[in-house]
Amino acid sequence: MTESKNDTKSWAPKQIWIKDVLKKSGTELLDISKSPAKAVAVKKSPAKDSATTKMVYYSANQLLIKTEQSSQAQFCLQVPPPLTATTTSVGLGVPPSGGQQEHFELLQTPQQRQMQLQLQDQHQQEQQQFVSYQLAIQQHQKQQQQQQHESITNAAPTAAPSAQRIKTEPVGGFPASAAVVSQVRKPSASKPQFKCDQCGMTFGSKSAHTSHTKSHSKNQDLSLNGASGAGVAAPVSTAAIELNDAGLPVGIPKSPTIKPLANVAAGADPYQCNVCQKTFAVPARLIRHYRTHTGERPFECEFCHKLFSVKENLQVHRRIHTKERPYKCDVCGRAFEHSGKLHRHMRIHTGERPHKCSVCEKTFIQSGQLVIHMRTHTGEKPYKCPEPGCGKGFTCSKQLKVHSRTHTGEKPYHCDICFRDFGYNHVLKLHRVQHYGSKCYKCTICDETFKNKKEMEAHIKGHANEVPDDEAEAAAASAAASTSAGSSAGSPSLQGVSSNSESSNHSPPSSPPATKKPRQARQPRVSKTVAATLSIPTSSPLSPSSLSSTYSPSASSMASPPPTSAHYLPVQMEADALSRDSGVSSAQPAHSTYADEEPTDLSMQQVQGQLPESTVDYYQAPPSLLELQPQPAGLTINPALLEAASIARRHDDNDDQVQDEDVHAAAWQMMQLCRGHGSLPPTEQPAPSHQPQVPTLHVSDLAANYDDTHEATVLIEHFKRGDLARHGLHKGYAPVPKYESALPNPDVVRRVEAAIGLRSSTESPERSSSPESDSLMMADRNVMTLPLRKRKHYMNKGDDGQVDSEKASGDGTSAAGGAASVGAGDGPGSKVMRMSSVIQFAKAS
């Protein structure tokens, strides 16, 4: 460099001496520190001074001497700034060639010149080493392509969708840029390959390549340590690594030497790998490790035929196909195939991002994400499309897989609404918006929609928490229904006015269950009465099973003082049309009927013919049903008296009184209801009692069993106490109250109802095959009133088939009084009728 600036005294004479020397040679010396800044570029010299040359001088810097020819018109300093403006930089100045050109010379000390020459020599040596190394890699790569194992090159590209990449570790003296350039990718192949740069082996997946390269770390460390200890750079072998027929490096056997070491220290592993000298405790681990050197993969997936070197890896991989995910996140509930995925997933909740990009400082959760991200900086695209003529590259295998669908036409995503197929998931999501709107996830339970899948899954879990509560409520409701059904016979006045067939609650269900509404909790009498009054007009017409086919309702309704438009339907008769299998009749005429209906009881046709101006018509069932079922017989008991007797027995004398005219009107209706059967000659019939009846009962027997005076007296005495008003009878309505037995045994209840009920229904298509219904007996009837085609449905088994009245009524006479036994009694020699259907009027409500 230059002399010291502090020695100004010694430097001043030198400046004078230099000026004198330069003046003699026609050169002028300028001090830039004392001259203006713009004096760096010297103005054009006059023609007369063109022979003189000016020199630019920087104080405390190197001196640059510039000479010009006399023919040049302008002086221009073209030296690079590091050579003239800085004091520490050392450049590689090369004087330009040419006689007429400018000549630059850098004034340097001998030490600086020697240092510069050493750096140049070192740089040239490094370049030569790098070039030789690159030539060795390329030569070995060509040989490897020719001798590659057939099982690796012919494998399907989908078996291991990973990139082919040859990684080379830079030698100690190489610059960092050399390591980047040395990553030579193998030319296009059907399957990406990863090649070990030390032994020349190729692998179809990145994980196998990484595992294999680790096996060389021990030998590599030893060689590097030996080379550094000797002080000599490790020589780079230019010879290619030889491979055998199996594609393995020459010198590596197919199987390891499984023999414990002779001199092993206590606690050390006795089994050593003969390739990398790594030791293991058991031979199985040595065999598994040795596959990283040989590349053997004996375990194959039966689903996708992917090969694995470790059996445990195959077991974990198989869970992808079997959808088994035993490792579950405690935070969000997501499950994974193996513990490693769960461990990486937990970083999402903890916020840990341990992998950081050295270029842009971006962080990642997984190391694979960082590797893919680094390719955006390096521009590497190792995943090439194998389709001829395409040649597109991608940074990750997933992008290549999606791109390949453009060539194969695969559309793996399906719309569950219109069944259209799509090749991309994001296109399917956009399509589903057309069906669902922006909220394209729909709950399968309540049809609520959500914007994303997580919200829908959380919502469905809420439904799962509600299931036990619903089951508890259903159990409580069923218990309440059974309790109310069991206690309904004890207090029939609390149930409102309904059909007497309601008592058969436990009969086998042959009618549709939807026709019977579940019973609600008990309400006060006033509210139940109002509900009964409001529900009457909405009742459906009676089916042919009702008593309207046996009674003569037109005569009774026209002769009665109340209006003929009175509703005779019970409260719960909505399902009457669906209960034609019942053996118990409602004994009520229909309010709204049809003009083409005819009575099913042929004995009543004469009475119908005498009243051509009747206001009540009847509905005729389909002929197919009439031909298959027997016709009804005569009435056996008056349900009104049964209800009157039960009410009189259960209620005390403190009830409210009702007006006498309403009581008389209701009693008169019931008496006229019975008088309609007086057209046929009556026979001698004993009074209602527990004694057996006469063997043959006719339809007209009912008229002789009732005394008008006694009947009216009984009704007036008991209905005066408010019972009639509570049953809706004080305003002209005369429905027959419901009769329910107090017996807890449903079998006894069915037998009593079969004995006292009317057999007037046609067979329903929903005929039950219950053995209990077939074993029920019913009272004798006048079979001669049926058509000839109907009689074949009845089997006469003689006079020995008597049904005991005590067994038929049982304890049920406590609720029905003596009238129950009247309808149930069968004298000796009565005909035994086997019922072919189930009592269903209990389910009609």
Swiss-Prot record:
Q: Does the keyword field hold Repeat?
A: yes
What is this protein called in UniProt? Krueppel homolog 1
**The organism of origin for this protein:** Drosophila melanogaster
InterPro entries given in the database record: Znf_C2H2_sf (IPR036236), Znf_C2H2_type (IPR013087)
Zinc finger region(s), C2H2-type: 194-216, 271-293, 299-321, 327-349, 355-377, 383-407, 413-435, 441-463
Q: Please list the residue ranges that the record marks as compositionally biased, kind Polar residues.
A: 582-591
Does the entry feature the keyword Zinc, yes or no? yes
SMART domains xref list: ZnF_C2H2 (SM00355)
User: Cellular component GO terms, alphabetically?
Assistant: cytosol; nucleus
The organism's superkingdom is given as Eukaryota
One example GO MF annotation: zinc ion binding
Locate the region Disordered. 141-164, 469-610, 757-845
> What spans are recorded as compositionally biased (Basic and acidic residues)?
796-809
In the record, the note on similarity to other proteins reads:
Belongs to the krueppel C2H2-type zinc-finger protein family.
Function of the molecule: Plays a general role in the hierarchies of gene expression leading to metamorphosis.
Q: Which Gene3D superfamilies match?
A: Classic Zinc Finger
- The gene that this protein is the product of is Kr-h1
SUPFAM superfamilies recorded for this chain?
Answer: beta-beta-alpha zinc fingers
Name the keywords, alphabetized.
Developmental protein, DNA-binding, Metal-binding, Repeat, Zinc, Zinc-finger
Its GO biological process terms?
metamorphosis; negative regulation of compound eye photoreceptor development; negative regulation of neuron projection development; regulation of DNA-templated transcription; regulation of transcription by RNA polymerase II; response to ecdysone; response to starvation
